[in-house]
Amino acid sequence: MKNLRHYDVIVSPIITEKSTMISEYNQVAFNVAPKATKPEIKAAVEALFSVKVKAVNTIVRKGKVKRFKGIVGRQNDVKKAIVTLASGQSIDVSTGL
């Protein structure tokens, strides 16, 4: 049985125009938990998708400031991970987790 912690680390795959462009370089983009570390992300991707990970780069996108009926609020921060796979490896993100 796969470790349930891995499903908590990887929230969802990112399917955008930019993420399909980086797939040419054997990379895949995921939304990950805000407190997830690079080793945790690497272990989760390797366990869930049965692939070998070469590198993990992370990005924290700060939440935007929004106003609703004069009240100022802020969206949540989002952490993204760009996972570089070893040569010959691939992940089909359209199938889901």
Swiss-Prot record:
Pfam family, one: Ribosomal_L23
Domain of life the protein comes from: Bacteria
Keyword RNA-binding carried by entry: yes
Function field: One of the early assembly proteins it binds 23S rRNA. One of the proteins that surrounds the polypeptide exit tunnel on the outside of the ribosome. Forms the main docking site for trigger factor binding to the ribosome.
GO molecular function, one term: rRNA binding
Subunit structure: Part of the 50S ribosomal subunit. Contacts protein L29, and trigger factor when it is bound to the ribosome.
GO BP, sorted A to Z: translation
Stored Gene3D superfamilies: 3.30.70.330
Key words of the record: Ribonucleoprotein, Ribosomal protein, RNA-binding, rRNA-binding
Family stated for the protein in its record: Belongs to the universal ribosomal protein uL23 family.
Protein name, entry field: Large ribosomal subunit protein uL23
This protein's GO CC annotations: ribonucleoprotein complex; ribosome
